[in-house]
Amino acid sequence: MWKRWLALALALVAVAWVRAEEELRSKSKICANVFCGAGRECAVTEKGEPTCLCIEQCKPHKRPVCGSNGKTYLNHCELHRDACLTGSKIQVDYDGHCKEKKSISPSASPVVCYQSNRDELRRRIIQWLEAEIIPDGWFSKGSNYSEILDKYFKNFDNGDSRLDSSEFLKFVEQNETAINITTYPDQENNKLLRGLCVDALIELSDENADWKLSFQEFLKCLNPSFNPPEKKCALEDETYADGAETEVDCNRCVCACGNWVCTAMTCDGKNQKGAQTQTEEEMTRYVQELQKHQETAEKTKRVSTKEI
């Protein structure tokens, strides 16, 4: 009896494999003479017609390059994919990590987690968790994706049925590949980057804005089929894409994951504000003003969506 079931299972696997091969051959045939350009790939529509879309996922080989926007990418593909997704022109400036800017002038930028950093960390976490899936056997029960997430959630939850940023970070640190995001040349900034990207992941699915994730929010955050939205920053009735910059005196503010992040340097000389140097209180007020613009834009967007 078991031989018959085994033969049936093998037959089903063979049929699925043949269908996958046929779909692949069909796509290869339709897209044979289609050139989509860097950062894009050919896909087949429901009507069987070719179309060019931003690359869904690059191969994870590590060959860092510095983009013309000053950001370090894991490889050429990630750079061109980011350019496609953001609709901006980004070129390879040079191979390797972007060099650290030592100037304390307005060119100095705050350490931030861009959407591409956040999405790369999320991709690595999902890849790690999917590798732990164990299919059901003939006489044993395996582990599906939700069960694996539930296991890690319970392991790092302190008992309040919520994961805060420190607990989430400890969870991520269990996997060396997932945590090894090295956008900056020095380890201290990379360590800070990891914490910022964990905060950005929490913000993705934190529906009640308490900066903690329930299991359902945790499940949504790391759901492979969930497509993180592209958030923009608002300022003076204008919207700015991820990576956009603005300056106030000698400080630089960067748009990252929908939020303005600013340096906090004391200004003097030609960057002096009036007859006084910029105080920490003044800088705080400026950042709060930026965030106020952002919140107003988000509320307007939500109201417009409801009216539609």
Swiss-Prot record:
Places the protein is found: Secreted
A GO molecular function held by the record: calcium ion binding
A Pfam family assignment: EF-hand_FSTL1
Annotated keywords: Disulfide bond, Glycoprotein, Heparin-binding, Phosphoprotein, Repeat, Secreted, Signal
Sugar-bearing residue positions: 144, 175, 180
Top-level taxon: Eukaryota
GO biological process, alphabetically ordered: endothelial cell differentiation; endothelial cell migration; hematopoietic stem cell homeostasis; negative regulation of apoptotic process; regulation of BMP signaling pathway
Ranges where the VWFC domain occurs: 233-287
Signal sequence, start to end: 1-20
Gene Ontology CC: extracellular space
Record domain Follistatin-like: where: 30-53
Phosphoserine modified-residue sites: 165
InterPro entries, per the entry: EF-hand-dom_pair, EF-hand_FSTL1, EF_hand_dom, Fol_N, Follistatin/Osteonectin_EGF, Kazal_dom, Kazal_dom_sf, Prot_Inhib_GrowthFact_Antg
Membrane-spanning ranges: none
Quaternary structure and interacting proteins, as annotated: Homodimer. Interacts with SCN10A. Interacts with DIP2A; DIP2A may act as a cell surface receptor for FSTL1. Interacts with BMP4. Interacts with CD14; this interaction promotes TL4-mediated signaling cascade.
Name of the protein: Follistatin-related protein 1
The organism of origin for this protein: Macaca fascicularis
